[in-house]
Amino acid sequence: MTNKKSQTKPLQSSKQTNGKDLHTAQTGAQVLVEHIAARGVKHLYGVPGGDCSLDIIEAAEKMGISFILTRTENAAAMMACSEAELTGTLGAVLTTRGPGVANAANGVAYASLDRVPIVFISDGYDNNQASVSHQRFDQTAMLSPVIKGALRLDDVTALPAIDGLLDLAISGRPGPVYIEVTAQCMRNTILTGCLPVRIAPSTFGPPTVEALKLAHGLVLGSQRPILVVGLQCRDKNVTKALRAFAHKLQCPVFSTYKAKGVMPEADPQLSGYFINGAAEEETFRCADLIIMFGADPVEFPPTAFKYGSTKVLEFTNAQFDRCVYQPALSVAGDLALAAMHMCECVRPSSWHAEELRKIKTHMLTRATANEGGPITPQLLVETSCHLMPADTRCTVDAGVHMLSVIAHLQSKDPYDLLISRGLATMGIALPAAIGMAMADPQRHVVAFTGDGGLMMCTAELATAVELRCNITVVVFNDSAITMIGLKQKSRQFERVGMDYGHTDFAMVGQGFGCQSFRATTPAELEAALRNAFAREGPTLVDAVLDPTAYRHQMLSLRG
């Protein structure tokens, strides 16, 4: 096994090993499945091949793990990621070698940069097949930049290393690990008692007393701090402690996109979303301390940090190789403990309630996208939010439409919205919605996607239909990759390569058996959404909109 970050932790025996007959033999496939089942895996997503995949699927079904056949390997990884994010457990993906691995690479990169623990399983060749070239390349080498570790199971003697690799996926900064299996290992047997399932606890140590004292001093010495909360705060214990800290401090709170819901939208302290852009600049110029709490560098756009002259206090559960800002102090350790300690000593800042109200109003105004029509991006989001069932969760694809969704969707808790921010990949809203629906079938999921993103994963509508997922796909249909088109225009280039031909996604959805509706006017939009939300199973609303408002919105928010 090759690990990029080795960590030594005490081991705890899982209860699943109790009562095992030491003389019972299991195949390698059964052992592998047992070990991922012990991590809470309920679904195995993928597109199988004709070799070891079959052994693993058979073992999984017998152990209560359902194999979910997807249309693409990339989407399979995205579904596994969204289920893992929502449940806090390990996600699992299975593909064949060669093209299966290559096609899954984007989804694995998403797991890496968006900090999601998944295990990616694919088959390789047995050691006695050295002469074979068909579908052969160094799969581990290809995945190496985006995985935390890898393990090749070419013999049953390698099976004891599985737990260490799975521990690696969930420890520190979560991420993907890769297991390459062979027929020799998957089909041969080993005595059950030789391989008890052992799971190392995944916890962060407390921050040092010295670091907390220094942090107390920085906060007490500031009059107008601003709190920025990031993806590491989505753990329920961290969220609870962070909210208490924020309320004690009584300062503006800005969220990253992935942390949406950590502070409820209705909270008067939640001012808006930090993107190092133009909209929040006026507020940040008034701050004498920026507290980055649980923010990950992958969440920030690749632009120079605007506030280098303002002290930055960082709280993080893991140190980073690179970051857009240089903190005056970095406090590493358990974030819930850090927030509780800070809450004990801080006092309310000098920000007034009326200032907080004005900042919140200012940020919402800057996010307005109501120019043109008849259907504008803001109208589409606001109408969807007004009509969607209570407690609906959402996903949003990469693209300019996400600006309206982030600004106007009312989230109460972490994971009410899922977005790819680290990789910022297109084509994720639909697969992520399927994964969320599989993890929690009782809550409806809305996938907000542009037409470009949907065309990258359209076939997964068939997957949603077969699984009878309670999802609604809302399509921002403007027949273009609009965000890139706006950047092209800002550089005064001729418009080339930005426009798609017209697509009727309602007809496409119907072809897959998905109940689909089309809207070109506000009245049609309301009727389509009401129809979609009233039905069981997957639905789609194809909203033909005017993209005119995007240009002003982009300039207003980002500059």
Regions flagged by a language model, labelled:
Residues 2-39, 149, 157-223, 343-348, ...:
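Cofactor-/ligand-binding subdomain signature composed of acidic, glycine-rich
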Residues 5, 121-162, 258-356, 488:
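Glycine-rich, acidic loop regions that bind phosphate or pyrophosphate groups
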Residues 25-109, 113-114:
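N-terminal cofactor/phosphate-binding cores enriched in small/glycine residues
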Residues 72, 85, 231-315, 412-442, ...:
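Glycine-rich, anion-gripping cofactor-binding loops and their flanking helix/strand elements
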Residues 2-23, 180-181, 192-194, 308-402, ...:
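Phosphate/pyrophosphate-binding active-site segments
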Residues 42, 85-95, 99-122, 145-195, ...:
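Structural signature of the thiamine diphosphate
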Residues 29, 37-39, 49-60, 359-431, ...:
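Active-site diphosphate/adenylate-binding microenvironment
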Residues 129-134, 322-323, 332, 339, ...:
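Thiamine diphosphate
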